[in-house]
Amino acid sequence: AESLIEVLDAIRDFFDVTDDCEITLETNPGAVSEAYLSKLHDAGFNRLSMGCQSFSDDVLKTLGRIHRSKDARESFAAARAAGFDNINLDLMFSVPGADEDVWQDTLDQMLELSPEHISFYSLQIEEETPLYDMYKNGVFAEVTDEADRKMYHSAIECLKSSGYEHYEISNAAKPGFECRHNLKYWSLSDYIGFGKSASSYIDGVRFTNATDEGYGKGVLMERDFLKNSKTRNMIESSDAEFAKYKYSEFHVNDFMDTASEFVFLGLRRTAGISFDEFEQLFGKRFADVYSGRRNEIEPFIESGDLIEDENGLRLSERGFDISNKIMAIFV
């Protein structure tokens, strides 16, 4: 706890942190105690995100998780006792061997806890993982697209009927508890990450810190560079020696990069994108920028997967099922 508190104190020393700032702590069930969480809550952490994934022990075993469902319930109770009144639970569906009834039971148990925020994701079986090896060896069959979509929509229906607002493809929240830092990403606002592998987006520049020991060397070299250089421009200094060590990726967006990111990130939200906001940000009308792709956009509007009016563009609930295909138009 002390190291996390030191990080938070350092941020407060160097930045203006508002009294109502959302400060999220991520954890896993069974990994924290009430005393530990109380110390962090007292220090200023006010939102907790917990990787439950499921309330089925069989599903947790399939996923290779070391906790069990009772650990999730106990950790949630500990968080409430520690003072956290803004808690997110991560859940996963389309796990091999877990049918719609198992998923519904997880949703029901989640609702009994009544967290403020829910993130729900479809399992993607990635290569070079134990699950992929089991799949390739015929231990289980991949969940069908039809079953996957049924579980997704049952989650949305269940959450809406319980007072949650479905505000992003994979996220729902009680009114006023939308995840602020995720909304920053989806609205293309600036953010900064510290430490190895951390990613940032500032003034149209995307960069990711290195993962190896070179990062520390790069930070020290950057300090010396800034002492002896007049430039404070990130792009101008990206060719400096320190940048080769500090960053694993460094990309300067051009106009279309930024416009496209604004659109496909904005379409993740159920509210979609605003044409007025687009024009204010880019000085051009959305219709003019994407006039050459109108023939790709129009079929999705006609099919009801995309909804366009005078205010903006958004995905329909059915459109969320093929969101990757639609967003690919703008990449």
How would you label these PLM feature ranges?
Residues R318-V331:
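Short, amphipathic alpha-helical interaction segments positioned at domain boundaries
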Residues E2, R294-E298, D321:
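Auxiliary N-terminal substrate/complex-recognition segments of SAM-dependent methyltransferases
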